[in-house]
Amino acid sequence: MPHRKKKSFINKKNAVSFHLVHRSQKDPLAADETAPQHVLLPTVRVELEKRKEEQRNFGVFFDDDYDYLQHLRESTQTAELISAPRVRRDTRLKPADDEEHMKEEDSSVSEASIKLPSSVFASEFEEEVGLLNKAAPISGPRLDMDPDIVAALDEDFDFDDPENMLEDDFIIKASDVMGGGGGEDDDEWEDTDDDDGEEQDFDSEAGLSDDEEGGRREFMFADCETKTRFTEYSLTSSVMRRNEQLTLLDDRFDEFYKQFDDDEIGALDNAELEGYIEPDSARLEEVIKDYFIQKEKDCQKPDQLGPAELPSVREEDEEDEDADEELETERMVIEPPAERWDCETIISTYSNLYNRPKLIQDPPKPKQIRVSSKSGIPLDVLPKRGLTVKQVERMERINDSDLPRVSTQPRSRDENTEERKARKQAIKSERKERRTKKKANKLAFKQEKQMQEKQMVHLRANVQGMKLS
């Protein structure tokens, strides 16, 4: 009997893993004692993330669940054939019903079926504020509460003040005040409305008068000094009355911000602007026009450069000139003046550091180098005569160690026989040393020449071998 592979209880491909976590504070069931305080949270599929990371290494960046690695496997890898379960179909179904039935089967096979109660999962709807934040005390001013209650909670309410003590019949008085206080007041209001018939402006800061409302106005905010140097009302003054501590705090705040008034703050630092502007921009043309207009205003005319004259003398001179012009009038043809070119520009009025006008010169052409056809040496480069002064100076700077030491020394006239023998012997030894060095140099040059010839022979043989191959 053949061995059959036992079907596993859990299909790892379609299986879903969960984490057991605490229920969220925003969950409405967090305050329910019957509901479990721990819920199941589906885990993120790590294998999918690993597969996507491996796909990125191969250059596949598609963000879907398809396995592209199956097309990148080796062709020599063995494949395993898994038989699919047989699905029974009812032949009596209609074609349309048959297609719907096939879609339902495919969806049922592909999707994992989870049959767990909803209480083990988190609620779909969550509240905006958590359970612990709801129970937390509220800090800050309460605009929706009565100022007396806020003052009492902050321990700023003066219980010893006789005005703050309630009388025995305060409920009856309060009901009389809220009831309207009689029909005479109503008649007065109706009469004023009928007589005026126009819109009236009411001051919101002044409040209601004692004649109109009686004892309704006990604690009005208009009695308190709530204005600051920034706003008409402060945040705390809109909720509670100002006591000594709050007034002192406001005074310190105003005193501190006096340092930032317009009179106290100095001029701001100039901003360093960087950028590029086109030479033909309209903004640059406007600036240049303004500059010329300002220069025309500042410059003086030739008439203004001389000594000041009395106005009477100036008027007489002008009258004489007008009379002469009226008497002698000749017609002359005035030609327009020729346009004059000048090297001075608007930049030269500031500085001549970069503006240096001069004639444009044609640079001399470089002399053509001629080469000798025999030697290949450029002509007119080497000296034609003897040594120049620089060459003589260079020869004189030669190191003395390169010249003969004994032979170059002058012979003394007063030398004796022993000194002459010693001098001749030194010259002989020096010449012998020079002959030895000369012989060694010749031998070294000869060996180097032979070695280079051998290298050339080997190189030619290698080149010929490469050509033949």
From Swiss-Prot:
Residues 444-467 form a coiled coil. InterPro entries: Ltv1 (IPR007307). One of its GO terms (biological process) is rRNA processing. Residues 183-213, 315-328 have a biased composition (Acidic residues). Pfam families: LTV. Residues 88-106, 394-403, 411-433, 445-454 have a biased composition (Basic and acidic residues). Keywords: Coiled coil, Ribosome biogenesis. It comes from the Eukaryota. Residues 88-112, 175-219, 298-329, 394-454 are annotated as: Disordered. GO terms for cellular component: cytosol; nucleus; preribosome, small subunit precursor. Disruption phenotype: Knockout disrupts ribosome biogenesis and embryos display aberrant cartilage structure, defects in digestive organs, characterized by smaller size of liver, intestine and exocrine pancreas, and impaired definitive hematopoiesis. Belongs to the LTV1 family. Essential for ribosome biogenesis. Involved in organogenesis of digestive system and definitive hematopoiesis. This is Protein LTV1 homolog. The lineage of its organism: Eukaryota, Metazoa, Chordata, Craniata, Vertebrata.
